Amino acid sequence: MYNPYQQPSYGAPQQPQQTGYGFNATGGNAMPQSQFQSTGYYQQQPTYQQPGFQPQQTGFQPQATGYSVPQTSYQTGFQVQQTGFQPQQTGFQQQSAETNTELKIPNIRLSFITASDQSKFEHLFRTAVRKGETAISGDAARDILLRSGLPPVTLAEIWSLSDTNKSGSLLFPEFALSLHLCNLALKSEPLPSVLPEKWSNEVQSFVDAISFSVPEDPSKILANTPFASLGTEEKTSWMDAPAAPSTSFQPQLTGFQPPQMPAQRTGGQITAQRTGGGSLIPLQPQQTAGLVPAGLQRQNTGYQPPQPLQSQNTGFQSSVGRQNTGYQPPLQQQGTGYQPLKQQNTGYQPPLQQQGTGYQPPLQQQGTGYQPPLQQQGTGYQPLQSQGTGFQSQGTIQPQGTGFQPQSTGFQPQPTGLSSQPTGKPGQWGFVSTPTGGIPGLSAMEQHFLPNTQLSSNNLQNAMGGSLKTNVTWAITKQEKSIYDGIFQAWDKSRQGFIDGETAIGIFGKSGLARPDLETIWNLADGDNKGKLNKDEFSVAMHLVYRRLNGFDLPLRLPPELIPPSKKHIQESMDSLKNSLRGGNNKPKRTQTSSSLYKHDDDDVGYVSTARHRKKSDSSSGSGSGTMSIEQLKKEIREKKILLDAMDSEDRDSSVLSQRDREWNEREIESLKFRILQAHNKLESSGISGSHEEKVQLLDRLRHLTQDKMPKLISNIHVVNNEICSRQMKVAKLRLQKEHPDWAPEASDADIVGTGPNGEVTDYDRKKFKSKQLLKRRMAALSGAKTGSTDTAVDDQLAKATEDAKNLGDQQRKMIEEISGSIKDLEDGCISALQSTTREDSYEKWEKGQGVSSDVAAFIRSLPKSEGSKNGRNEKTQSPYTQPTKSQSQSAQSTQSQSQSTQSVQTQPAQPATYSSYSSPEDRAAYIKAQAEKRMNERLAKLGITRRKETGSKAPEVPKEPVEAPKPQEIETPKETETQRETNTKSTSQTSKAEPQKVSVPPAIPSSSQAPAIPSPAIPPAPEDDSEDEEYAALMKQKQEMEERRLRKKKEKEERLARLKREMEEMNKEEDSDEEPVTSVPTYTNGSVKSSTQPISQSEEVPKTEEEKSGESEQTASKPEATPTEQAPKPDLVSTSAQSKANPFSKNNNPFFKPTQTPTIDPKKAAAQRDSQRGLGSDDWSDSDDNSSDDDGPNRAGAARLASMLFGGMAPPPRAPTIEKEETGSKETAEVPPPTEVAPPPVPAAPPASVPPPISAASSKETDSDDEWGTPSAEAANDHDDFDFGNNFEPSMAPSPPPVPTQHIPEPVTDVPPIPQSIPPPPQSFAATVEDAPPPPPIPSQVPPPPPPPPSLFPTESSNAPPAPPPPPPPSAPSAVPPPPPMAPAAPPSAPAPSPGGPPGGAPNIGALLGQITGGKSLKKVDDSQKRIADGATVGRVVD
């Protein structure tokens, strides 16, 4: 068949083709493969030749253009004609079973594939694609790709790159791309991970071109047309035809004709058709398969349209006037159509008979003879209007001299009388015939709109302007589309697929149209208002420009023919999706139906709701239920029973499954509860879960200290430091003036009076001062007066002193800044540890059970929260590091200064502890404060500043792990064990007591009455009668003494540490040898915290045996010359451990006080006492300091204060030097024999007459006393937070109490006030201020009575101990006043004056104080190694 849109080049090799139907003798349909071309009906006969026909050369190669019937005996037609073209295949001849000649592939070149490769790929593609399909299936493509021998992984990558649409099949451009990638892989070239943009754009354009060229279904074309009935009758013909036509022409037998056309008369009437494209559009050659010539791509059909065809004789050229081009006379009649066609005679018959050349049933028979005035006839089943197929005198071909009327051979344009119309639906581009006559200027438009052309718009308008055609539609033809696409690709150089608005305006502006027209065109093209145009939208705009240049009016709306297919497809998809969603979610309203109403055909729509069928089935079942028979009803009943049984079975199964699920869920819940409980217990045991409120309180307290209090302190320190510098410079100047009376110092910068803000010296002040000095010198030079100093040495000394003072001030300032930085670091660390990471709502939800279900809340409340806190309390009760509660901490602030002065022995923790090792918030807070204080004191130590507190030689005490106390029965030991322990202790003490004699003792510090106190950095004002040089000498001497004392303390610290290590080893050996279980290893803890694990009761009766009393008397009598220093620390060494106090037979190294019963403990009182013992101040900071240089020596001021409190009513101790006291004590202590251990006698009942002195006075004095457990005085409270720049207290040692006599108990003193029947309650809180304390009692004028037994003073209500024994008898009157300390049982001396270290309120009640000391449960036992007196490190300290 000839396609008018295919134009091959001359000499191009073409494949043979056959475009007609071949009939055999029986009328059957056959498609043989012929190698030659025949121009009419002929049969090949090897023996018979027609004499009148000679072959002629027409420049074309032979080509079969009609129905060729293979015969083996004769030929009746024409001779073979050479047409100049090689045989070619046009898609209508099946050369082999594998080649799909019907497949239409656009003639588009892929730039990345060579032309030869693309032709090979196309041939391979045609052989693999079945007829009726346009894409190769995945299986077929897989088989082809596997032939390359590549691994499957590589082929899978190639497939993913080639299948651009992800459809599972490949169109030709995708198939060619896959083969090209295979070639690259075979050449060992790497495959691209993503297709290059150029390749992707070309392949996508090729795919779009194939999608646009898909023909329409003939059934859809015939729908709603008068030819619909004819189309349905010939469905078999459509099925039998090689391909479906889409033009208005039927196959003709006399020329190159499209398939599926009914045969025409082959005699004298040949329908003219357009076969070469005419003079309209020169088309490029291309191969198609069974598609129409009007709107399809061009194909090579053999003839070249530009070459004018010469007329040729197609009949007999002899004398025969006319010939039959059908069958020759010797042949029998045959059917030239399908089987139902009637036979016709094709021999020589002057009056030729009519023969059917088309489809017989619908067509009327036509005469094949000579009929000049032939009428137009319908040539096939088509939706188009009929066209004239008779003789039309047109074209350039000369009429043939065959006896027939001249006719066109089909190579000229169609008659202009036919109206061109689109053959597809509106909006489907490329299926529109070019308007007859054409619209001019298309080629000029293509050249005008290219990017590099600079042509005037007048040239373009002159090329346009053809006469308006009324039969021209808005549809875009293939030729126009190709031109528009070429312009688009020329402008879209980056291959983005879009042209922006600016570029489009420049392109459209070349047309010379008015601005309103261009705006209208843009609005019509860019319907989505994107601001840019894709290829289809650009084609629409260019088409509108083209039509407007030809005089057409622009439409107000975009015609349906111009709607881009891509946009239409997207819109249709969106509409269908919306309809499906609307129909699926929203049920249509039920409308009243009636049989009289018009019913829509459901087959017309693509989506049919299932609700319609459901409605029909419901109505049918409802209507038929009334007419069901009995058998049907029984059947329904049986079916319903079966359904009910099935439902019951399902219910049972579901119930079983649900029961299993419930059981499984319950097990899971229990398992989770158990895991939660384990985690909770783990958290409680580790102590990680601190209270949120406690953390908030501690954090607030920390911020108050660091943000409010600390900045003020630092500011005050800076002020004092500046004042010290200025005073030092003034003192140096005055000293030099006194030493050199004739020396007149020159005014220095310090004499400049500043006039700036805050008295600052400005530049103006300096200039003014210099000018004054210069003027003064000049005046002195004129008058000869003396202007300044002539002694340069003195000036140098002054400058040096001034510089030293400034340097010292700078150093102090830097130290303060370092301390401030350390405080900031400590603050950050504390804040990070105290900041709560738990949200408040989460805490309320998971800790208190708020906002959760009742079951979860009940489980949360059932968690053992109290157990963790109870364990924490027990641990804190047993731990020697117990921290006070908030109220106790506040109450203990007022007693810190007293405890600082009385506690001096500090021990070292056995193991280093960390923050995470403490289980309670109090312990962690204590650890944080201990670390903070340690760092603070490190900074303060550099300045020589120490806070007024107890001194020690170890690091700040931190809490340690609690130690469980053994049971009472484990503590009780027989007397033999106790005796053995005493023996071991004596030997150890003798060894340890001899050691201090070898240790160098620092020189005695002058007492407060003999030596001035160590001055602070601020130099005190000198007395008026003292000279300046004496003040300076005293200052330098004090400074030198301070430095020497620091060196001594450092050396003493090292020696003391070594001695303590030795003592520790000895004690460990001693305790290892004991059979009694030891409750805790003696450790050196901070003196600010007691080491007891049990609370301390307010009173405890500790009676002494007669043997002990006699031993004490002997010991005292043998040492009449003993100094008070020997026995001063004994009240402090009375302490015993809690376990020993609970055991009446436990060993105690103190011969004075041995417990005989287990007292009742009051936790609140014990906590208050521990607070005071720890030395907690008002700011909750501990007083322990490891690196303070002033902590190395003994707190002699504390010892003096303790001695004054204990023995204020006795004779004042002698002012002996400390060295002598220590030496004497050392010697005398070594000579003291150990007391004999005697079993204690039974406790007698306390007689009512034996009453101690009144307690009221003691309790009143206790408020103002300076003891360890009492409320501090006003001076002590005020001195609590002060910084001490030296030990300013008198280092006098406190005397020990007199021993209890062993004689008979005398009659009670009659003038003693009666004792109250009930003991007044001890103070529950130590927060009482000094104002609340009662006034001190007057100094007694008579000799005070002997102290009663302390245990009888503080019995508790819950105490189950036996009544207290009677007090010991008073000693007999001595012959003379005993030497101090009065230890003999003589009459008490006269009332002495209060000692300087005593409290301002007078002598305290010694009995009450001794009762509290002996009642302390936290005092541990002390071996002989620590009972020595000469050691300065333990003087006046309470041993923990």
UniProtKB/Swiss-Prot annotation:
GO cellular component term of the entry, any: endosome membrane
Compositionally skewed regions (Low complexity) per UniProt: 39-63, 385-398, 882-914, 1140-1155
Key words, A-Z: Actin-binding, Cell membrane, Coiled coil, Cytoplasm, Cytoskeleton, Endocytosis, Endosome, Membrane, Repeat
Domain EF-hand: start-end pairs: 150-185, 513-548
Coiled coil: 627-686, 1024-1076
Protein name from the UniProt record: Actin cytoskeleton-regulatory complex protein PAN1
Stated role: Component of the PAN1 actin cytoskeleton-regulatory complex required for the internalization of endosomes during actin-coupled endocytosis. The complex links the site of endocytosis to the cell membrane-associated actin cytoskeleton. Mediates uptake of external molecules and vacuolar degradation of plasma membrane proteins. Plays a role in the proper organization of the cell membrane-associated actin cytoskeleton and promotes its destabilization.
Stretches with biased composition (Pro residues): 1232-1255, 1311-1324, 1333-1353, 1362-1402
Principal subcellular localisation of the protein: membrane
Residues covered by region (Disordered): 1-67, 234-285, 297-428, 564-629, 861-1440
Compositional bias of kind Polar residues: 1-21, 245-257, 297-384, 399-423, 573-583, 985-994, 1080-1100
SMART domains: EFh, EH
Locations listed in the record: Cell membrane; Endosome membrane; Cytoplasm, Cytoskeleton, Actin patch
Domain named EH: residues: 117-206, 480-569
Biased composition regions of type Basic and acidic residues, renumbered to the chain: 867-876, 921-984, 1038-1067, 1101-1112, 1218-1230, 1420-1430
Organism listed in the record: Meyerozyma guilliermondii (strain ATCC 6260 / CBS 566 / DSM 6381 / JCM 1539 / NBRC 10279 / NRRL Y-324) (Yeast)
GO biological process, one term: endocytosis
